[in-house]
From Swiss-Prot:
Similarity comment: family membership: Belongs to the UPF0201 family.
Top-level taxon of origin: Archaea
Database matches in PANTHER family: UPF0201 PROTEIN TK1335
Transmembrane region(s): none
Protein name (Swiss-Prot/TrEMBL): UPF0201 protein MA_4659
Length: 164
C-alpha cells in the first residue's frame, strides 16, 4: 500500500496586449479541465521585456488538473516526445519539481506540444511539485510512462495521491 502524498500543479501564461484573453483562457482550460484562473500582475522581469505582457493568468490545483493532459498525450500518441523534452530540460536537480512549457496555439485546439524554447508571445508554463523524488517518479510513471512503439508498457493508477 502506498502512503498518500500531495502533488501541486501550477499553470500560468502571460497575456500580451495583442492576444485575446478569452482565447488564452480557453487554451489553458482545454488542457487543464477545471482549472480556476486568476488574473495576476506581472513580476519585474516580465515587465522589462521588449514586448511586455499585459498580465498573467495563473491557476493551481492538485493531480486532478493533470487528468485531461494525461488523456490528450495518449490520444496524440506523443508520450515519448513529451517525456524526452520534459526530462531533459525541466526536472530540478533535487527531483522535487518539474517545469515545462506548452504551446498556446496548439493547446487552443487540444494538442499538448512542448516548444523547443520560450515563444515570442510566451507559452503556457506548468510547474509540478512533489514532496519527494519518489513521488515525482510515480507521477512520471503515470503521466509519461515508458513505452514500446509509442504504447505504454504499463499504465499505473494514481489513487494513492491526495486530491488537492
Amino acid at each position: 500500500m502506498w502512503s498518500r502524498f500531495m502533488i501541486n500543479v501550477k499553470v500560468s501564461a502571460a497575456v500580451y496586449p495583442t492576444e485575446d484573453p478569452e482565447k488564452v483562457t480557453k487554451a489553458i482550460s482545454v488542457l487543464f479541465t477545471g482549472i480556476e484562473l486568476q488574473k495576476e500582475p506581472l513580476d519585474a522581469a516580465e515587465s522589462e521585456k521588449r514586448v511586455s505582457p499585459a498580465f498573467r493568468l495563473t491557476g493551481e490545483g492538485g493531480l486532478d488538473l493533470l487528468f485531461t493532459l494525461h488523456g490528450l498525450i495518449r490520444r496524440e500518441a506523443i508520450i515519448d516526445s513529451i517525456r524526452n523534452k520534459v526530462f531533459s530540460k525541466g526536472l530540478s536537480s533535487e527531483g522535487l519539481l518539474v517545469r515545462f512549457l506548452l504551446n498556446k496555439q496548439a493547446a487552443f485546439v487540444g494538442i499538448p506540444s512542448v516548444p523547443a524554447e520560450e515563444e515570442p508571445l510566451g507559452s503556457i508554463e506548468v510547474v509540478i511539485r512533489t514532496d519527494s523524488p519518489e513521488e515525482m517518479e510515480k507521477l512520471f510513471e503515470w503521466l509519461l510512462p515508458l513505452t514500446e512503439e509509442g504504447v505504454p508498457v504499463v499504465e499505473v493508477e494514481m489513487d494513492y495521491v491526495e486530491r488537492g
